[in-house]
Amino acid sequence: MPTISQLVRKGRKTLAAKSTAPALKECPQKRGVCTVVKTTTPKKPNSALRKIARVRLTNGYEVTAYIPGVGHNLQEHSVVLIRGGRVKDLPGVRYHIVRGTLDAAGVADRKQARSKYGAKKPKQK
């Protein structure tokens, strides 16, 4: 424990906050190419087949990203945009793919929360 005079001389070092999405390098989104598209199972107590993609980013990083929404058109060599945001029940998945941009099509027949899934406004009758 430091003395008062030591604190006056040196002060306390502030700990730098650790980034939750280090591969983005302070950018809001990054572009990348899918290397693997597959499904995986979540950890207990959940059960599902979650769609994920391994993405090589333009800065050289390779990350695992979640594909949100029902159905997708992604395959190997698809160009995608990723954003930060982890998936709580998938360990190691810290990024989301942005739907409706580049090669990732928006979710079909989506009526609510459309902007989050890149869905266009449905035609009025």
Curated annotation (Swiss-Prot):
Keywords associated with the record: Methylation, Ribonucleoprotein, Ribosomal protein, RNA-binding, rRNA-binding, tRNA-binding
BP terms from Gene Ontology: translation
Record GO terms (molecular function): rRNA binding; structural constituent of ribosome; tRNA binding
Database matches in SUPFAM superfamilies: Nucleic acid-binding proteins
Disulfide bond residue pairs: none
Modified residues (3-methylthioaspartic acid): 89
One of the record's GO cellular component terms: small ribosomal subunit
Cited HAMAP family: Ribosomal_uS12_B
Annotated protein name in UniProt: Small ribosomal subunit protein uS12
Organism: Clostridium acetobutylicum (strain ATCC 824 / DSM 792 / JCM 1419 / IAM 19013 / LMG 5710 / NBRC 13948 / NRRL B-527 / VKM B-1787 / 2291 / W)
Family: Belongs to the universal ribosomal protein uS12 family.
Subunit (UniProt): Part of the 30S ribosomal subunit. Contacts proteins S8 and S17. May interact with IF1 in the 30S initiation complex.
Pfam family, one: Ribosom_S12_S23
Role noted for this protein: With S4 and S5 plays an important role in translational accuracy. Interacts with and stabilizes bases of the 16S rRNA that are involved in tRNA selection in the A site and with the mRNA backbone. Located at the interface of the 30S and 50S subunits, it traverses the body of the 30S subunit contacting proteins on the other side and probably holding the rRNA structure together. The combined cluster of proteins S8, S12 and S17 appears to hold together the shoulder and platform of the 30S subunit.
